[in-house]
Amino acid sequence: MFTKKDALEIIIAFIVAWLFYQGLAVVTGTKMPIVSVVSDSMLHTEKFDNWWGSKSAYYSDLEISREDFKKFPVPRGLSCGDLLFITRDDNPRIGDVVIYSRPGSDYTIVHRIVDRSDNIYITKGDNNAAPDAPISNSQLQGRMVFAMPLLGSPRLALYYIESLFRGIPVNLGGQCSLARI
């Protein structure tokens, strides 16, 4: 039986979680210290050597070697549902996985920096055929510090369930398979 005490414990748990998230935002310097990967744009669908064989021409044009790429954060890419921990970084490097937003969009994008000059960055999803339009430093939300495979899946499932109740068509990046969530 659900009691007032149970309700109070649930409310307290939500408040503690919210306070923890806000504290994490202050410590990391970004309003988004934890994000979930919502598309397959960073997914490597094959072993690294095979993946590199199909992508090497693009990266070679940018003077990024196979050895360079293997030293980048998450050289084997990210999967839909991975949970990322983010920190503010006003000077990310080539190879860093960054989170950014486009003006007028509510969505954030998780892609890798493949080129830069001054405070302009070219990003690309490892699984995408072409790079994104350039972004500025002001669009950056942060840089990925580490990833925890699939721990973001419950958040995506809750987002999907909420969208069903609200009657909003769900688009988890256009490529994220709900069967894997």
Can you name each region flagged by the protein language model?
Residues M1-P92, M148-I181:
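Protein maturation boundaries and topogenic segments
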Residues T30-M32, R102-H111, D132-S138:
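Short coil-to-beta-strand transition motifs
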Residues S65-E67, I94-S105, K124-D132:
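Short aromatic-glycine motifs in intrinsically disordered, low-complexity regions
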Residues N91-R93, G104-D106, R116-N119:
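Short, charged/polar surface micro-motifs in flexible loops or helix N-caps
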